[in-house]
Amino acid sequence: MIEVARLLKNEVDIRFLIIGEGKKKETLIKMTKEYGLSSCCFFTWQDRDTLPYSLAAADVGVVTLNDETAQVSVPSKTYNLLAVGAPLLCIAPKCSELAYLVSHYDNGTCFDKSEVRLMADYILTLKNNMELQKRLSDNSCNAAKDFTYQNAQNYV
């Protein structure tokens, strides 16, 4: 996403909030400094009482999935983003479960990690098309209803 932020550097009203303490955090911070990006803000890990507010503040939720686990998993943060009605920008293989979820619920778009320009264009499209953003947001909220704790109990 830092490369996407770099392409959108002149869009003064677009911010990238990066939450967590993953092993790539220091590299990402270094990249933002090298590129002179003031649009990227880093937040530490957040507890479950705080996190929903941060996620709900976003106009787009980003979910990444590596190639090795693409066929068998969906990152858990996906469900938190659905619950707050975030349109999704997913970086994952087109054949992944995550790509299927986004396609099935029509609540975002899935990109290959090399499609940096397309990701930037998608963000600009959502910024400039509030009707589309609202539709995707509503679809995320509707999708969240299928992924409740109670529904999960039906499969355990």
How does the language model describe each region?
Residues 58:
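An anion/phosphate-binding loop that grips the pyrophosphate of nucleotide cofactors and donors
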Residues 124-128, 149-156:
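C-terminal alpha-helical cap of glycosyltransferases
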Residues 118, 125, 132-146:
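A short, well-ordered alpha-helix in the C-terminal region of glycosyltransferases
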Residues 46, 76, 114, 147:
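Residue-level signal for the nucleotide or nucleotide-sugar donor/cofactor binding architecture
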Residues 1-13:
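Short hydrophobic signal-anchor/transmembrane segments that target glycosyltransferases
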Residues 12-20, 25-50:
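Nucleotide-activated donor-binding/catalytic signature segment of Leloir-type glycosyltransferases, i.e.
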